[in-house]
Each structure stands twice: as structure tokens, then as C-alpha cells.
Amino acid sequence: MQIVELNGNVLLEDFEIEYITLTHSILEPNGLRIKTPAGVVLHTGDWKVDPNPLIGDEINAKRLKEIGDEGVLAMICDSTNVFSAGRSGSELDVRKNLLNIMGRLKKRIIVTSFASNVARMETAFYCAEQTGRQISLVGRSMHRIYKAARQCGYLQNTIDPIDPRAVSYTHLRAHE
């Protein structure tokens, strides 16, 4: 196994691979510029252009333009809303709206998300703290990703989640 730094390069026999910073709901997404004897292939995986990512770097639009200007034999990409007109919202937009909602409501709020969306998890923690709420993570994947994100230096300035057993219906009912 080889660890590749963000914006790093790897040489694999006839393939020169350059990592390009992208944005998405997962941490540190990268596109790959793969230089082959036949030409350059750009592989992005799933990605989106988020002008205000809350975690991680902004998309390296300058480098993507340079690659396009140099010429690309093929682009292999995936983007969930590619056929939807307009732009998808930023995670910052989600944070502002969730903070507004949580500030107005007085009772229990349940926020659901993909466990892999650490920025969304961080948004939920932030909004809970700003509105004087507690937060709990439910599900093995949520706990696993939370722990991994903390170990990698993310989610460092968040409130501690409470044990999910402490948020049972009967426990909360007594406090409503």
C-alpha cells in the first residue's frame, strides 16, 4: 500500500497518475489524470462543484481547466444530478437552513444522512451546539465513520455525542 498526498503523483509503469482535488460529500475526493501512451484519461468518480465546502479544500478548478486545455482522450465521471439544470447547493447552504430550522423548533429533531457524509455530520453537530441541543449517533456506520473522522483530524471542535441508549422514547418523553 502507498499513501498518496493530496494533489500527489504516482508512476505505475506506463501510467503517470496525478491526483486532483475535487469536492463531494465524502472526505478528500480526488480525480485522477492518467497519462497513458495513448493519451490522457480523466477519471473523477462521483463529484460536485461545491463553492463553499465545510470540510476539505475547494475543487482545483484551475488544474481541471489546464488538463482540459492540454487535451483529454476520455473523461470517465459520475455525478448524481448531472441532468438537473442549475447548480446543486453547497453544504454551507444546508448548514444555514438546518440552523434556522433547529433554532425555531422546540422538540426533538432527527437528522438523517449517509454516514460517509462527514461534512453533514459536522453540520448536525454544529447546529445542535449552536441551538443548545444534545446529539446522538445511531447506527454502526455512523459510529465507525465518526471515530475514523476524529482519528484523521476531522470533527475536532464538536460537542461529544451522547449514548444512543440515553435517547430512547421513554427517556425523552419524561423530559418533554
Where would I find each of the regions flagged by the language model?
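His/Asp/Glu-rich metal-coordinating catalytic cores
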Residues: M1-L172
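A short, hydrophobic C-terminal helix/tail in secreted or cell-surface proteins
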Residues: A174-E176
